Amino acid sequence: TGRSTLQGPDSNNLKWSFHTENIVDSSAVLDHDGTIYIGSQDKRLYAIKPDGTLKWSYDIGSKIFSTPAISKNVIYVCAWNGRIFALDLDGKLKWKIQIKGRISSSPVISANGNLFLGSDNYYLYKISPAGKILWAFATRKYVDSSPAIDNEGTVYFGSNDSRIYALNPDGKLKWHSKTKGQITSSPAIGPDGTIYQGSNDGRLYALNPDGKQKWYFQTKKWIDSSPAVSKEGNVYVGSNDGSLYALNPDGILKWTFKTNGVITSSPAIDSDGNIYFGSWDKKLYALSPDGTFLWSFTTGGVIRSSPTIGPDRTIYFGSSDGNVYAIGEK
């Protein structure tokens, strides 16, 4: 949902930056002790201590576009070349498997520990915690979208075949809904079970859990950013037209905030309702719930990475300048 129970920083103070050797499009995930895990196009997964020093790195032999996932002290990371790795918290390999097709979709872990992820070979996969492929569901085009899973275990995701899919936990199709453009953005599920999905037709779609369309909202360009939903049910989404849109649960526009670049970074909402997101104008933005500008932080490159809110009012994100940034209180 992009919603956090933690507070974000109230200023743009740089705590530290950590340099990798290539673009960082991946977003950060944190474990219980605050270690930050993030991938880089330099082919390494990095484990960074909360003070910004390296804990370890692991060479996975191919660029990392997707965001890692953590469950039960295991880190799962997907490589562009179709390899999936499971590492322990010390960076030791537990297993790796190869699927056909490149992976830019980020793995999502269900309540019982199974992994769900898409591939450029048109499939969405369900993989056990031991690395066994349990099933693969065929779409008609690339699956770059990362799935979302509801409380019943239904799996929602989009495909470049312009469809939003809902699957049962056993991989059987519940329904699909057609959009007017390819889908690379990932869905979000609202507090009432509504599924929100952006598409390259420039629309944000709101669907009921049975697949019926509730409404859509039209932006001026395609949507690669995934929506975030506040606890009140307000929806925030970025568009390639450079604006962040805030909509109420009925799809009525509350406000827009214009940046000077494409927005593919997905917003993060903190416990106060403040919204954080990156733009191709090289800035990370912080806005209040009513769309008021709070602060921005400028990096040396386009920001496609989505911000992650950690403890101690710190935000972590990557930039195409090759750095991972920690913004927070001194």
Where would I find each of the regions flagged by the language model?
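Extracytoplasmic/lumenal domain signature
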Residues: 1-330
